[in-house]
Amino acid sequence: MRIDILATAALLAQLASASPAPAKRQTYIACSGLYGTAQCCATDVLGLVNLDCGNPPSLPTSPDEFSSVCSAIGQRARCCVLPIVSFMRLIIQDYPISY
């Protein structure tokens, strides 16, 4: 009887140690490459220039959250190439990067 209990305990311990570790999630990067600056912008001029832009108030963890964070302050999520001055961004991409 003791051998059965010890064998069962040893088997359970071995199974528990063999289970895979939880996978780490990759950090979401809203904008990358040429369009590397994540911004919340209010005014779009011909899809080339956005006015009244600023950094998102919180770090987004998904494309939907990036859009909702900017929407919450009355602006739209944009990925920009070149900051010209603090209130204007040049050459934008309409949508943040998805998974």
Curated annotation (Swiss-Prot):
Its main location: secreted. It is found in: Secreted; Secreted, Cell wall. Disruption phenotype: Leads to increased growth rates, conidiation and enhanced tolerances of conidia to abiotic stresses. Reduces Arabisopsis thaliana root colonization ability. It holds the Pfam family Hydrophobin_2. GO terms for cellular component: extracellular region. SUPFAM superfamilies: Hydrophobin II, HfbII. Keywords: Cell wall, Disulfide bond, Secreted, Signal. Induction: Expression is not affected by carbon nor nitrogen starvation. Expression is induced during Bionectria ochroleuca self interaction. Disulfide bonds join 31-79, 40-70, 41-53. InterPro entries: Cerato-ulmin_hydrophobin, Hydrophobin_sf. Aerial growth, conidiation, and dispersal of filamentous fungi in the environment rely upon a capability of their secreting small amphipathic proteins called hydrophobins (HPBs) with low sequence identity. Class I can self-assemble into an outermost layer of rodlet bundles on aerial cell surfaces, conferring cellular hydrophobicity that supports fungal growth, development and dispersal; whereas Class II form highly ordered films at water-air interfaces through intermolecular interactions but contribute nothing to the rodlet structure. Belongs to the cerato-ulmin hydrophobin family. Homodimer. Homodimers further self-assemble to form highly ordered films at water-air interfaces through intermolecular interactions. This is Class II hydrophobin 3. It comes from Bionectria ochroleuca (Gliocladium roseum).
